[in-house]
């Protein structure tokens, strides 16, 4: 799954390019990156921590489909949480 380690700017650009799909297919209202990538401390082995807020709360299947979708477009292991879970 891993390629060259992406910068935070590259990750944000990828997410921007997929904004329409994220909103239409997964009802994503907002996305925030936190953890090592947000602090600029990521390593080759780091996953990316993403917090998502939804327009409509998804069922578990749709939530994990979103996590898989993000991993595929970013080519990085994603640790996904919801805004309501913190």
Swiss-Prot record:
EC id: 2.7.7.108
Statement: the UniProt record of this protein carries the keyword Chaperone: no
Annotated Mg(2+) 2 binding sites: 47, 49
UniProt keyword Nucleotide-binding, yes or no: yes
Binding site residues for Mg(2+) 1: 47, 49, 79
Short motif (GSX(10)DXD motif): ranges: 35-49
Broadest EC class assigned to this enzyme: transferase
Cofactor binding description: Binds 2 Mg(2+) ions.
Protein name: Putative protein adenylyltransferase MJ1215
Organism, scientific name: Methanocaldococcus jannaschii (strain ATCC 43067 / DSM 2661 / JAL-1 / JCM 10045 / NBRC 100440)
Lineage, opening ranks: Archaea, Methanobacteriati, Methanobacteriota, Methanomada group, Methanococci
